[in-house]
């Protein structure tokens, strides 16, 4: 790997080039670590929904007359398998919706979307994980129940009415019933696929083997094909002539009589109705498509729209190599619109055609300047490969570089919680290292605005924690420009900047502008003191937005302070952006 200069940034400029077609795929997760009332409300709500669906389905199969003979063979395992199947179908459908990024961005941006809804949308990854968890729990119950069903089909063979049987004779090996039927084989494949997806989704494994996680996760179309075909074999039978053969009639049909309503304490054989024919059975119709059809269509429409928007490479206007292994890329894309706090998915075709990585916009396009920028922290195989490709251009002339630089494709933009910075009178932005990127877009927005008069935001606190002093140079010029702009407009109190250095070595602060130099403190910030100070200064502000982008430890600490420092008069609203 080539070395990155530690002093002055190195800039490479490229002229616009001809766009060409290129398909794309995406993968990203926006991670929310801390439990707040949004998490709890959704978890309680979704638990109630799943319990209700399970209970209603369980009772239906327990008491419905057309399942009497099937229920007589399988017992309670029939009800458990069908109840868990409904929960499984429900979550297989719901798990799609948090991944419809374009739809959620449009919905989040409407004026009708209240804060509670926006905060829920920002927790799309949490909702996705909750649905996956219920899906796995339902799968376990469903598998165990169907193993019991296979055993009961073998031991409780119905010799009177052979149509209702799955086994061909009494005592047939249950394993054979599972391994030689469409339902059994497709079920085994689905379980294996879900286990692989779940194991590779563990944060530790995903972090170190992201490509493997991505490949396996994108096998989900196979899962849904198996899910839709799972019941096509028609193993479970339901009675289709309940009107002419009422379960519980006195006709010798070889079964225990039961009235239509299925109450065991109300069975009276001597008063039961006589039947005029034997029971007839048809395969039980699948209900899976009723659950998943609409969510799949919504997801496909969202996916097609995103692919259409990201099929052309963007124009690379410039590349800047910053200290501390950070690369700044400036792009231009036709009709690209974004707002501060949003992020994009980036793909470099010379590195991988399938890997898309999330990066927060550090400067959004405007009417005067249609370009936008991102800052990439070189950490990992993909970012290292991108850096190597860009470094190669430093040894070529501009004409050659313009035609040989790697092509980049952009998907998005997508929403993040930092979009709400301007929706509060007072906002506190807390960043750890490269977590400054979403707030850089906010600062750039303030810098580029002609006037701040129409903004709701009146006070912005920026707390930036870094280990190296070089990190502050990423946005030192921009922060200084904003400060002088506010000073000229006679509103310097709008921006309050506090920088903290946590490294062990003695820092060299001489490279920083005087404005930032006066605001640097050594050591970790006393967050509780800062929160108390903000609450004391903002007595006229009831709601204060707190936005965090950094390590899990930092986010947890800030979340706890938002709860402990909130009073009846002043409430701190916690928001987190973190990309896994």
Predicted regions and their residues:
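Reductase modules of NAD(P)H-dependent flavoproteins
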Residues: 242-275, 368, 374, 379-383, ...
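Membrane-interfacial segments at transmembrane helix termini in multi-pass membrane proteins
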Residues: 285-321, 329
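Membrane-interface recognition of transmembrane alpha-helix starts
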Residues: 22-64, 77-94, 126-143, 178-191, ...
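Extended, low-complexity, polar regulatory segments
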Residues: 1-33, 116, 371, 500
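Classical protein tyrosine phosphatase
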Residues: 93, 125-149, 432-463, 568
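Juxtamembrane membrane-interface segments at transmembrane-helix boundaries in membrane proteins
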Residues: 23-38, 66-87, 116-127, 157-188, ...
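Membrane-embedded alpha-helices of multi-pass membrane proteins, especially ion channels
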Residues: 46-75, 89-110, 134-156, 167-173, ...
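Ferredoxin-reductase
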Residues: 314-405, 467
């Amino acid at each position: 790997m080539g070395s990155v200069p530690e002093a002055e940034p190195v800039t490479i400029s490229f002229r616009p080039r001809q766009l060409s077609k290129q398909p794309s795929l995406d993968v990203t997760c926006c991670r929310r670590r801390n439990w707040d009332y949004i998490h709890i409300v959704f978890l309680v709500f979704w638990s109630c929904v799943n319990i209700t669906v399970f209970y209603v389905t369980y009772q239906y199969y327990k008491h419905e007359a057309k399942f009497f003979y099937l229920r007589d063979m399988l017992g309670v395992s029939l009800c458990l398998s069908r109840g868990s199947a409904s929960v499984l179908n429900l979550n297989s459908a719901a798990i799609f919706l948090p991944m419809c990024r374009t739809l959620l961005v449009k919905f989040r941006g409407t004026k009708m979307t209240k804060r509670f809804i926006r905060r829920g949308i920002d927790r799309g990854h949490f909702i996705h994980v909750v649905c996956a968890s219920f899906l796995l729990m339902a799968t376990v119950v469903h598998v165990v129940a169907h193993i019991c069903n296979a055993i009961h089909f073998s031991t409780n063979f119905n010799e009177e009415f052979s149509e209702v049987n799955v086994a061909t004779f009494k005592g047939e090996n249950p394993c054979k019933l599972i391994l030689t039927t469409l339902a059994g084989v497709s079920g085994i494949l689905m379980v294996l696929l879900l286990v692989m997806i779940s194991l590779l989704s563990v944060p530790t494994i995903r972090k170190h083997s992201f490509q493997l996680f991505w490949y396996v996760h994108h096998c989900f179309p196979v899962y849904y094909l198996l899910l839709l075909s799972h019941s096509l074999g028609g193993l479970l039978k339901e009675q289709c002539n309940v009107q002419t053969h009422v379960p519980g009639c006195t006709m010798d049909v070889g079964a225990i009589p039961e009235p239509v309503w299925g109450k065991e304490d109300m069975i009276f054989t001597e008063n039961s109705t006589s039947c005029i024919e034997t029971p007839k059975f048809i395969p039980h119709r699948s209900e899976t498509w009723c659950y998943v059809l609409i969510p799949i269509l919504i997801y496909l429409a969202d996916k097609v729209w995103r692919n259409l928007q990201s099929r052309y490479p963007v124009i690379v206007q410039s590349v800047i190599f910053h200290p501390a292994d950070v690369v700044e890329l400036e792009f231009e894309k036709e009709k690209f619109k974004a707002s501060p706090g949003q992020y994009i998915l980036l793909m470099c075709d010379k590195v991988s055609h399938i890997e898309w990585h999330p990066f927060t916009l550090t400067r959004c396009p405007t009417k005067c300047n249609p370009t936008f920028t991102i800052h990439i922290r070189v950490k990992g195989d993909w970012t290292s490969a991108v850096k190597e490709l860009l470094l190669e251009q430093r040894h070529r002339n501009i004409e050659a570089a313009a035609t040989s630089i790697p092509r980049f494709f952009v998907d998005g933009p997508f929403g993040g919680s930092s979009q709400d910075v301007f929706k509060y009178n007072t906002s506190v932005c807390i960043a750890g290292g490269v977590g400054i990127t979403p707030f850089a877009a906010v600062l750039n927005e303030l810098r580029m605005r002609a006037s701040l008069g129409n903004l709701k935001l009146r006070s912005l606190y920026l707390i930036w924690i870094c280990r190296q002093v070089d990190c502050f140079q990423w946005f030192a010029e921009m922060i200084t420009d904003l400060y002088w702009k506010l000073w000229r407009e006679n509103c310097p109190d709008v921006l309050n900047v506090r920088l903290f250095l946590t490294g062990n070595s003695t820092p060299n602060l001489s490279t920083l502008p005087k404005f930032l130099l006066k605001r640097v403190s050594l050591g970790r910030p006393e967050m509780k003191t800062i929160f108390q100070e903000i609450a004391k200064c903002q007595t006229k502000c009831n709601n204060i937005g707190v936005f965090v982008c950094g390590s899990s430890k930092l986010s947890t600490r800030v979340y706890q302070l938002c709860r402990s420092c909130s009073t009846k008069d002043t409430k701190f609203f916690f928001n987190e952006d973190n990309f896994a």
